[in-house]
Amino acid sequence: MMRIMLFLATNLAVLIIASITLKLLGVDRFTGQNHGSLLIFCAVFGFAGSLVSLFISKWMAKMSTGTQIITQPRTRHEQWLLQTVEELSREAGIKMPEVGIFPAYESNAFATGWNKNDALVAVSQGLLERFSPDEVRAVLAHEIGHVANGDMVTLALIQGVVNTFVMFFARIFGSFVDKAIFKNEDGHGIGYFIATIFAELVLGILASIIVMWFSRKREFKADEAGARLAGTGAMIAALQRLRAEQGVPVQMPDSLTAFGINGGLKNGLAGLLMTHPPLEDRIEALRRLG
């Protein structure tokens, strides 16, 4: 899923910008003493950031990757790509998404969009050049699985919940620091502002661990969908090809590399922020499906 990290970054940026704006406008002072009102206030802005990210996800993905949408196929490869996505979409019971190709040497693909009937599926030029037709079909089926499963909407809801609690507890922490350490009893001072922003950054990272855990679980489900649509053997072969290419340098920005079918490698604590399970685990899970 070549969308998660940009989605998270957008959410965090919205939270911080909202915090600064609300502080400058003086809105925070009306919610600081009433925790019920504060929670509602945080929920409104927490879900706003999540929904903004969801609704502009296609535009962000196109701009960030340089994806060229195929409207009129110019080659037999583009024609095959459109026909394959149309067939897989029909089998999955969704409206055909937009189809695109983005210029990247590494083998990758992504699907995004605010609902299953208004989505985008794109593959890298490198994947088209090096993968067999059956393997490309399996990768497309995996991405169609994400769309059919409604993963982006579910992710937006989860992100909205964690955004809410990040904003809420950051402000509780900010009030404590402002009063207990800075001894400010007259509204919100500079201590509140600094502590709130700091807490949002820290809690935002911790909240990302929850979202990444969800993302890893959904990868297994997308693999299962890919196996149903394209065949278990083809899905395993595609993942094995990705595993063989793990040493290929990634040309895309770091904020986007975790958005695709190939999520890269991380070890130790960094593994908690992986959007994808290890390829070995995904292959083994497919083998258990038979």
From Swiss-Prot:
Active-site feature positions: E143
One GO cellular component, as annotated: plasma membrane
One family name in Pfam for this protein: Peptidase_M48
Annotated TM spans: 4-24, 36-56, 150-170, 193-213
InterPro entries per record: HtpX_protease, Pept_M48_protease_HtpX, Peptidase_M48
Chief location of this protein within or outside the cell: membrane
Cofactor binding summary note: Binds 1 zinc ion per subunit.
Cofactor: Zn(2+)
EC number: 3.4.24.-
Compartmental location: Cell inner membrane
Membrane topology: Multi-pass membrane protein
Keywords, comma-separated and alphabetical: Cell inner membrane, Cell membrane, Hydrolase, Membrane, Metal-binding, Metalloprotease, Protease, Transmembrane, Transmembrane helix, Zinc
Annotated Zn(2+) binding sites: H142, H146, E219
Alphabetical GO biological process terms: proteolysis
GO terms for MF: metalloendopeptidase activity; zinc ion binding
Protein family per UniProt: Belongs to the peptidase M48B family.
Protein name from the UniProt record: Protease HtpX
